[in-house]
Amino acid sequence: MFDHFNLAAPIYDKIIRIYDHERMCRLLGLPAKVRLLDAGGGTGRVSRRLYPLTCQVVICDLSQAMLRQAADKGGLNPVRAHVERLPFDDDRFDRILVVDALHHFCNQQEALTDLVRVLKPGGRLVIEEPDVTRPIVKLIALMEKLALMGSRFLTFHRIERILHDLGMATHVEDDGRYIFWVQATKPDPAKPDYD
């Protein structure tokens, strides 16, 4: 299969829009001295701005060309791996983010399961995705299908359901236009919730 991301790597940061930094920091609970995994993080365009607010950032992606771009930014630790089979121990990361990438994962159920596995109890997972119920995103989904990118967009309801089934507490926000965020917290048995 043609690798669109290796081709786009040198210009990716120039053509892809900036993200909502303040919202991402709030949802992740940053600044905090935490270990952060940027799953599907590509060139590090998002995590390079989060790095100063954490103690360690690991970027996991399949595209070697994207990871080379990330390595050039400094402070980011690139790891080439499938998100469905992460090469990390259980309970390794305090925070995980997935920005505009979940729809590119081959098996989203397996990816979310493994992300929860490597998240520490009490840790947060934040997913930012285009809202496929919006007309503009439906058009993007069609274009990605025609480009043979293998994308599969999920609604936030579906993502929430998967995360609930994995035992996560969730919170959803949207920008009222075409982006949503799912924040999921892994229960911590040492700090029971009495609500």
Model-derived features: where do they sit?
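Local beta-strand N-terminus motif with an aromatic residue
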Residues: K33, F93-D94
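Class I SAM-dependent methyltransferase SAM/SAH-binding core
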Residues: L37-R85
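Short catalytic micro-motifs in class I SAM-dependent methyltransferases
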Residues: D100-A101
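A conserved beta-strand element that flanks and buttresses the S-adenosyl-L-methionine
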Residues: L97
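C-terminal lobe and adjacent flexible extensions of AdoMet/dcAdoMet transferase-like proteins
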Residues: Q183-D195
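Conserved alpha-helix/loop element of class I SAM-dependent methyltransferases that forms part
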Residues: I16-V34
